[in-house]
Amino acid sequence: MSVTSFLHLSNPGGGEFDTETFCGEMARKYPGTDTEQSQSKSLAYDITWSRYADGPQFEVRLDRTRRTLAVEYFHSADRIRDYANFILWIRRYFPREQEVVLVDENNEAPMPLSPEAATEEIEAWIFRAGV
């Protein structure tokens, strides 16, 4: 998959992505994931997680405001199902009570992403968005 998907926290005052917990869970769930944090103030996305080992491969970036996470690359044997589950897993690290929107890189297929969303809903979005 080469189309970027974004998970975006809609409300500017609604909290932020739980980076600390996410980092710990990422290391546990996806061993071998590289984490890089840039100190450059010129980059909008300053934390990158990348994994190119066996199993799911991905590249994920978090913006400085901690409100938007971009999945720039995802590949696995059962890509659609695994990608949908990966998106739902990421959603858990945004404030539960806040609206998170899932959108493609062209901003053409926005979808509110509830913490209770079903895998099938995300799979349908992936097909609609052409991701």
Located regions from the model:
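A broad, low-specificity signal for short, low-complexity segments enriched in glycine/proline
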Residues: R28-Q37, V60-R64
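A common structural junction motif
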Residues: G24-D34, R91-Q98
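Short Gly/Thr-rich strand-loop-strand
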Residues: Q37-S50
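Short, extreme N-terminal segment that most often corresponds to the first beta-strand
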Residues: M1-G32, G130-V131
